[in-house]
């Protein structure tokens, strides 16, 4: 077997095979993607122009919105245009690029969610020291660390993948470049590469989830000493973040804990976290947040004027 790349182009099977169903998906998912761009952009603008939103919590939220735009744009535009294409192709280099950036922005989002949980912990459990602990310099370092963590993770994934030989077949059973599906096309045994990739992603997920759960466990314990009104106010600031964490982690856990033979269901779940969740996050964060809603209204008024 020649240890070289004869494959320069890959073919996606897509989400569905029926052309009519694909057209319906195009009509549904295009507005969802546009809503993702609009909703997250509004949060970015609102946080940047509103003086009432110049706090660490909203700084992290605006950073999360930027990542949501980038992550969604890595996968969704190609997916949407492919819904109208008879043959869904991507170059091998393009596939590797998509893998790099999808893992990059995905891990940045995970770490940012952990940072936001820590921010809530400090705000609720150490309110008198909040501004000293969460200084502007610390906030910028935490966000920079999130981006650095995502970069290191993606570099590891891509360094493992690039040397693999691909000499055919060239069909990926997905609508975007998934590492596990790409490994199946390699003309060599990829057990070790697959193990390293899963360990890399799994370690980040487990550690992040542990910190998230621990942070909110400490918060809940500390709230036992508060009044009913104090508990209500504190929990209201955490509810949106907890919802977003659930939306992010549950679909991923569903995919990686199911047998590999149920891949059709996995593709449908992938639609949720690549297409739907980035649109829902701005809604979740603004639905019960009066300050954010007022800031967005002000940004619209300034735009109209």
UniProtKB/Swiss-Prot annotation:
GO terms for molecular function: G protein-coupled receptor activity; olfactory receptor activity. Gene3D superfamilies: Rhodopsin 7-helix transmembrane proteins. Residues 1-25, 77-95, 163-202, 258-266 are extracellular. Keywords: Cell membrane, Disulfide bond, G-protein coupled receptor, Glycoprotein, Membrane, Olfaction, Receptor, Sensory transduction, Transducer, Transmembrane, Transmembrane helix. It is found in: Cell membrane. GO terms for biological process: G protein-coupled receptor signaling pathway; sensory perception of smell. Pfam families: 7tm_4. Disulfide bonds join 95-187. Its main location: membrane. GO terms for cellular component: membrane; plasma membrane. It is a multi-pass membrane protein. The chain crosses the membrane at residues 26-46, 56-76, 96-116, 142-162, 203-223, 237-257, 267-287. SUPFAM superfamilies: Family A G protein-coupled receptor-like. It comes from the Eukaryota. Glycans are attached at residue 6. Residues 47-55, 117-141, 224-236, 288-305 are cytoplasmic. Belongs to the G-protein coupled receptor 1 family. Odorant receptor. PANTHER family: OLFACTORY RECEPTOR. This is Olfactory receptor 4B13. It comes from Mus musculus (Mouse).
């Amino acid at each position: 077997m020649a240890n070289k790349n004869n494959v320069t182009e890959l073919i996606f099977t897509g989400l569905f095979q029926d052309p009519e169903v694909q057209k319906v998906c195009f009509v549904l998912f295009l507005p969802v993607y546009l809503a993702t761009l609009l909703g997250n952009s509004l949060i970015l603008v609102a946080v940047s122009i509103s003086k009432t939103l110049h706090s660490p919590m909203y700084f992290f939220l605006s950073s999360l919105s930027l990542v949501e735009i980038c992550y969604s744009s890595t996968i969704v535009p190609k997916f949407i245009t492919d819904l109208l294409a008879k043959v869904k192709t991507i170059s091998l280099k393009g596939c590797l690029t998509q893998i790099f950036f999808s893992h990059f922005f995905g891990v940045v989002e995970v770490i940012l969610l952990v940072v936001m949980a820590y921010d809530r912990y400090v705000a609720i459990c150490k309110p008198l020291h909040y501004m000293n602990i969460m200084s502007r310099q610390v906030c910028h370092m935490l966000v920079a660390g999130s981006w650095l963590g995502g970069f290191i993770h993606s570099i590891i994934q891509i360094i493992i993948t690039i040397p693999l030989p691909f000499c055919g077949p060239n069909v990926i059973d997905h609508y975007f470049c998934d590492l596990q599906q790409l490994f199946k096309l390699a003309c060599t045994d990829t057990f070790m590469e697959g193990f390293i990739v899963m360990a890399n992603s799994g370690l980040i997920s487990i550690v992040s989830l542990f910190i998230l759960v621990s942070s909110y466990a400490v918060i809940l314990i500390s709230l036992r000493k508060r009044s009913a009104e104090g508990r209500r106010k504190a929990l209201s600031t955490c509810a949106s973040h907890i919802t977003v964490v659930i939306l992010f982690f549950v679909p991923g856990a569903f995919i990686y804990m199911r047998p590999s033979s149920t891949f059709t269901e996995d593709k449908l779940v992938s639609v949720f976290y690549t297409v739907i969740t980035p649109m829902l996050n701005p809604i979740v964060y603004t639905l019960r947040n009066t300050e954010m809603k007022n800031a967005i209204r002000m940004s619209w008024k300034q735009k109209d004027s």
